[in-house]
């Protein structure tokens, strides 16, 4: 469950390391974002000499949350951190690699490019 002022790790190689959520987009509850929701965030920590710089405002999709996600078959899934992947206006990732496991729900929400880059889909 991600809300405004929440910090997230960045799970790609776009150059950002941490982002802070400043707005939740396109969800039934605009206060909280879950896995697969698009957020607007500001880069708080970034690697040098990369395309994404510190204090850039970026769009990102949430790929992991510490809050347990309940699936329709009764199984719940929970990750060890809150993480997001930075995307462009066409919902394609800005980086070329994705790190760590990714939830299967992203495939249902038309983020198949991110799912194909992920090393593990849970």
UniProtKB/Swiss-Prot annotation:
Q: So which domain of life are we looking at?
A: Eukaryota
Q: What is this protein called?
A: Large ribosomal subunit protein uL14c
Cite a single GO MF annotation. Answer: structural constituent of ribosome
The similarity annotation says:
Belongs to the universal ribosomal protein uL14 family.
| SUBUNIT field | Part of the 50S ribosomal subunit.
Q: Which CDD domains match?
A: Ribosomal_uL14
Write down the SMART domains for this protein, in alphabetical order. Ribosomal_L14
| InterPro entries named in the record | Ribosomal_uL14, Ribosomal_uL14_bac-type, Ribosomal_uL14_CS, Ribosomal_uL14_sf
- What keywords were assigned to this record? Chloroplast, Plastid, Ribonucleoprotein, Ribosomal protein, RNA-binding, rRNA-binding
Q: Which Pfam families match?
A: Ribosomal_L14
In which compartments does the protein localize? Plastid, Chloroplast
What role does this protein play?
Binds to 23S rRNA.
Q: What is its main location?
A: plastid
Q: Name one GO cellular component term.
A: cytosolic large ribosomal subunit
Q: Which GO terms describe its biological process?
A: translation
Disulfide connectivity for this sequence is none
State the SUPFAM superfamilies in the record: Ribosomal protein L14 (SSF50193)
Per the database entry, which stretches of residues form a coiled coil? Answer: none
